[in-house]
């Protein structure tokens, strides 16, 4: 939720308040559409094929919605099925070409800690939950104990 609010604020600050659509992979964490709705964004779902984002469908959705209206593409990687989307760099390129941001939901970040750096595959913003990634109590012992990261822009 917070990263989406930051993304929306970024575009409002850069005279692009029309960017109110968030694309979400059909493999994304189940709470992602609710987060989008809570911060005033509409959601368009992008299909997957065998757990991998359908790149052609991603392009079609961008064309249908209009690149100028898209704030971000939200993906959980690895997905809730435990699959790593191997096309993540190409996804980032497609999303960035549309002028949008790649938002990584790190719900399953524990599979990647110490192995890869999400910034290397083009994530502009991400969060991860300490209760899943580092085995802390849900909420990290108190509400709101998540990590939020973003790029310099």
Predicted regions and their residues:
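Conserved PLP-enzyme active-site core in the AAT-like
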Residues: 1-153
């Amino acid at each position: 939720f917070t990263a989406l609010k930051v993304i929306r604020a970024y575009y409002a600050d850069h005279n692009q308040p029309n960017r109110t659509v968030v694309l979400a992979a059909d493999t994304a964490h189940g709470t992602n559409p609710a987060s989008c709705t809570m911060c005033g964004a509409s959601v368009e779902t992008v299909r997957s094929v065998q757990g991998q984002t359908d790149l052609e469908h991603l392009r079609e959705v961008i064309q249908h919605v209009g690149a100028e209206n898209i704030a971000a593409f939200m993906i959980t990687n690895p997905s809730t099925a435990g699959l790593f989307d191997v096309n993540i760099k190409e996804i980032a390129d497609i999303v960035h070409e549309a002028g949008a941001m790649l938002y990584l939901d790190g719900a399953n970040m524990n599979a990647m800690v110490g192995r890869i750096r999400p910034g290397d595959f083009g994530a502009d913003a991400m969060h991860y939950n300490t209760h899943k990634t580092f085995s802390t109590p849900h909420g990290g012992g108190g509400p709101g104990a998540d990590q939020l990261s973003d790029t310099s822009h």
